[in-house]
């Protein structure tokens, strides 16, 4: 108790050395500080336990009883360990925290050893010989080392590891080669021959042996068949197999099933597994066979097509309007959206007898579609033929009127109050071979048979005429539509059946008859009254510009040398739609001349001045109908100070104002209508225009041989504001900017202008110079310096050969 620390340390070291010298356990003294007396006891207990274990090992090895030795060792080791651990724990002044892992390792190391493990194994062998159950050994893993006695790890040699791996690979390759040789050793090579092929005796022996084996096999088969027939086994087996064969699901049960794939997607010789398509539990319908891989492939192909598909606009695309049974199938308005709204229509076919499908029905349906399609299209066309100027007899049949319709028209004409019994015949213009012209308004036209018969009836049944009138304005009288309505009542069914052209023709014929009747009434006027009327017109013409608006002067024309000369100078022949219509007037003149000749030539000179006149006898076809305004070409100029109307009239006479001929509307008043001749011309042209528009779409029946070598070269060019021709890209950009209402930015515009300037410089440059004229500048510089070269860098003095610098 009263010893110093130095003395206490020497005592502990002596105790540790004594314990180690006695051959006791390798147990280290506790780390905590204990009393000197307890340490000696613990070391003494440890040494006594070691001696007991040594004696028990020797005793067990001598007697051969491992079990008793092991039990004694276990008891002695446990007893010594308890004593060694219990005694120091009773009296401890200061104790540190225990290390459980360290103590367990120390105890296991003390209790286990090579001799004990061998004795347990020998004990188990003896127990096995005696038929007893072997002892269970709880093997405790040895730790690699402790803190006081660490165990060094094995050194890893990479060269040894590599050699070991190479050796393993060589062994595996040798093993694989050996197995391959064993497998291929049974197969004969091409160079090896069977010994019995070359030796005749060996071949005969082998043949006899094979024959014997065949005979034995046949005998065994016959014997087995006889036994089966005797015991009835074969019949039972056949019945059993037949029943199983009938119960099995075979190809005959596949008849009528639908395969939801196109028949072209199955290739010949390829095996495809079809399964039933999934459907809802409550969904009714037949079973459908599908292949999962083909469904995925079709879906992938469709997705690829949808990705690269562009929106198409085909407003005139014609789909097949006939189904498989040659029936008209309904067409949807927007067929391209049917798949999105109603879903995709899958391709399918049905399996036939035996589960086979050859696509015969699909091919038959396709052949029917092809036949129907070919029937609708014919490649045979009518050969070219010469265009006839006149209608053929077959075409004239369509223009003939029935007798019933003719009688009705004649009856309506008889109901007219005023009839022309002195109507001039139009002449024998029709012949059997003349069937009318295709060019309406450009030649003679045939008078319909209805008109001829009506004219004959009117001549046979004359009516008293009203008293004649000497008013020249009757020529300008307009026949209203209400009077024409008397010929054909609007409510009659016959009028509804007639086409528009026939109704217009009948109206014009009726008006023509009445106008001719009024003109014939004018011929019966007294000549004195005509002279007075002419004198009145002359007096009114001399009064001045106020008499210009008199409608009575429209029917008179005055000819003199000056007016004829001015008329010839001012006439400009035009043949367009807005021209003079000289051809139409010539036709009307020709018809009027024939009417005069048929009437006996009783027309007077005064009648010629009413509406028709001949300027030159040599040119009978050049007639001009002048109004009253044409006679005042060289009259006295009106006084301008009378007002604005006088000034405008003066400007109009001098040609300073552009006058446009306006179409006069039809009114009820007789003094506001057009002349009869002009009125008839306009109506005839309206009818002709209607038929000509219809003939525009008939096309030509013969090619223009004069235009065989004509190959038009059409070039569409665009220019900018400066007159420069634009490229297709620039033209498109200009149209796009004009359409969208926005142009390029500032930078793009500047770059484009710079590029245009460079192109202009390239066009202006000389063939021996650059666009900027550098060659010309170089020559000018050389000429100024009088040197055959030019200095690009440095000063001229440094490059001078006469100057020497150091």
UniProtKB/Swiss-Prot annotation:
Region (Disordered), start-end ranges: 1-121, 418-504, 578-610
Keyword terms of this UniProt record: Coiled coil, Isopeptide bond, mRNA processing, mRNA splicing, Nucleus, Phosphoprotein, Spliceosome, Ubl conjugation
Linked residues for Glycyl lysine isopeptide (Lys-Gly) (interchain with G-Cter in SUMO2): 125, 133, 141, 147, 188, 277, 329, 336, 400, 414, 554, 654, 663, 690, 705, 715, 729, 755, 764, 781, 786, 797
UniProt biased composition (Acidic residues): 450-460
Cellular component terms (Gene Ontology): Cajal body; catalytic step 2 spliceosome; Golgi apparatus; nuclear speck; U2-type precatalytic spliceosome; U4/U6 x U5 tri-snRNP complex
Coiled coil: 157-231, 494-540
Known tissue expression: Ubiquitously expressed. Shows a high expression in fetal liver and a low expression in adult liver.
Residues the record lists as Phosphothreonine modifications: 189, 430, 701, 770
Glycyl lysine isopeptide (Lys-Gly) (interchain with G-Cter in SUMO1) cross-link, chain position(s): 141
Family matches, as InterPro entries: HIND, SNU66/SART1
One BP term from GO: mRNA splicing, via spliceosome
Biased composition annotated in UniProt, kind: Basic and acidic residues: 58-101
Protein localization: Nucleus
Biased composition (Low complexity): 104-119
Pfam families assigned to the protein according to its UniProt record, in alphabetical order: HIND, SART-1
Annotated Basic residues bias: 32-42
PTM characteristics: Sumoylated with SUMO2.
Phosphoserine carried by residues: 321, 348, 480, 492, 527, 597, 602, 604, 627, 767, 795
Function: Plays a role in mRNA splicing as a component of the U4/U6-U5 tri-snRNP, one of the building blocks of the spliceosome. May also bind to DNA.
UniProt similarity note: Belongs to the SNU66/SART1 family.
Quaternary state and interactors: Identified in the spliceosome C complex. Component of the U4/U6-U5 tri-snRNP complex composed of the U4, U6 and U5 snRNAs and at least PRPF3, PRPF4, PRPF6, PRPF8, PRPF31, SNRNP200, TXNL4A, SNRNP40, DDX23, CD2BP2, PPIH, SNU13, EFTUD2, SART1 and USP39. Interacts with UBL5. Interacts with IVNS1ABP (via Kelch repeats).
Protein name: U4/U6.U5 tri-snRNP-associated protein 1
Source species of the chain: Mus musculus
């Amino acid at each position: 108790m009263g010893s110093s620390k130095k003395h206490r340390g020497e005592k502990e070291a002596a105790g540790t050395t004594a314990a180690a010298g006695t051959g006791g356990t390798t147990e280290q003294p506790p780390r905590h500080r204990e009393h000197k007396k307890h340490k000696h006891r613990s070391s003494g207990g440890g040494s006594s336990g070691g001696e007991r274990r040594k004696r028990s090992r020797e005793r067990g090895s001598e007697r051969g009883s491992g079990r008793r030795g092991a039990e004694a060792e276990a008891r002695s080791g446990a007893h010594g360990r308890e004593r060694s651990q219990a005694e120091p724990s009773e009296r401890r002044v200061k104790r540190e925290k225990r290390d459980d892992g360290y103590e367990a390792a120390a105890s296991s190391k003390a209790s286990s050893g090579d001799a004990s493990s061998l004795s347990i194994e020998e004990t188990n062998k003896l127990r096995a010989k005696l038929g007893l159950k072997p002892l269970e050994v709880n093997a405790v893993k040895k730790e690699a080392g402790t803190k006081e006695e660490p165990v060094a790890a094995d050194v890893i040699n990479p060269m040894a590891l590599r050699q070991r791996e190479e050796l393993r690979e060589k062994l595996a390759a040798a093993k694989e080669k050996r197995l391959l040789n064993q497998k291929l050793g049974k197969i004969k090579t091409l160079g090896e021959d069977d010994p019995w092929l070359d030796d005749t005796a060996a071949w005969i022996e082998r043949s006899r042996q094979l024959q014997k084996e065949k005979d034995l096999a046949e005998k065994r088969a016959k014997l087995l068949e006889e036994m089966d027939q005797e015991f009835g086994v074969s019949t039972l087996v056949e019945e059993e197999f037949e029943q199983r064969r009938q119960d099995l699901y075979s190809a005959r049960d596949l008849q009528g099933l639908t395969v939801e794939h196109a028949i072209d997607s199955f290739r010949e010789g390829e095996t495809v597994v079809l399964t039933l398509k999934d459907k809802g539990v409550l969904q009714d319908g037949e079973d459908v066979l599908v292949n999962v891989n083909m469904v995925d492939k079709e879906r992938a192909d469709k997705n690829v097509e949808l990705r690269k598909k562009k929106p198409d606009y085909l407003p005139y695309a014609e789909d097949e309007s006939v189904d498989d049974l040659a029936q008209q199938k309904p067409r949807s308005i927007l067929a391209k959206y049917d798949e999105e709204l109603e879903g995709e229509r899958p391709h399918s076919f049905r399996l036939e007898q035996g589960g086979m499908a050859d696509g015969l029905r699909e091919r038959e349906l396709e052949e029917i579609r092809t036949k129907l399609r070919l029937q609708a299209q014919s490649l045979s066309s009518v050969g070219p033929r010469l265009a006839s100027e006149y209608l053929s007899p077959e075409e004239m049949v369509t223009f003939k009127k029935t007798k019933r319709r003719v009688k009705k028209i004649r009856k309506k004409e008889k109901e007219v109050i005023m009839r022309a019994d002195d109507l001039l015949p139009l002449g024998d213009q029709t012949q059997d071979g003349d069937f009318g012209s295709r060019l309406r308004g450009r030649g003679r036209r045939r008078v319909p048979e209805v008109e001829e018969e009506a004219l004959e009836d009117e001549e046979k049944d004359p009516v008293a005429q009203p008293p004649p009138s000497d008013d020249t304005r009757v020529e300008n009288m307009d026949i209203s539509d209400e009077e024409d309505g008397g010929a054909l009542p609007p409510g009659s069914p016959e009028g509804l059946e007639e086409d528009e052209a026939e109704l217009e023709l009948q109206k014009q014929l009726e008006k023509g008859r009445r106008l001719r009747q009024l003109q014939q009434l004018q011929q019966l006027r007294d000549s004195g009254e005509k002279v007075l009327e002419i004198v009145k017109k002359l007096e009114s013409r001399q009064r001045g510009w106020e008499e210009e608006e008199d409608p009575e002067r429209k029917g008179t024309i005055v000819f003199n040398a000056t007016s004829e000369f001015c008329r010839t100078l001012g006439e400009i022949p035009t043949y367009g739609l807005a021209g003079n219509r000289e051809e139409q007037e010539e036709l009307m003149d020709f018809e009027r001349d024939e009417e005069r000749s048929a009437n006996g030539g009783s027309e007077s000179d005064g009648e010629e001045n009413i509406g028709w006149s001949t300027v030159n006898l040599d040119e009978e076809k050049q007639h001009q109908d002048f109004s009253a305004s044409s006679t005042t070409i060289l009259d006295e100029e009106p006084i301008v100070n009378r007002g604005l109307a006088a000034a405008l009239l003066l400007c109009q006479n001098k040609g300073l104002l552009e006058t446009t001929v306006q179409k006069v509307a039809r009114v009820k008043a007789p003094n506001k209508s057009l002349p009869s001749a002009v009125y008839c011309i306009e109506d005839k042209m309206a009818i002709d225009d209607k038929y000509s528009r219809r003939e525009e779409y008939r096309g030509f029946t013969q090619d223009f041989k004069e235009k065989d070598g004509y190959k038009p070269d059409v070039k569409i060019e665009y220019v900018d504001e400066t007159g420069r021709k634009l490229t297709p890209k620039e033209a498109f950009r200009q149209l796009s900017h004009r359409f969208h209402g926005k142009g390029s930015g500032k930078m793009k515009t500047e770059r484009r202008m710079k590029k245009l300037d460079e192109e202009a410089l390239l066009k202006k440059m000389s063939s021996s110079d650059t666009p900027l004229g550098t060659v010309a500048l170089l020559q000018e510089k050389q000429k100024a310096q009088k040197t055959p070269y030019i200095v690009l860098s440095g000063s001229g003095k440094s490059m001078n050969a006469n100057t020497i610098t150091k």
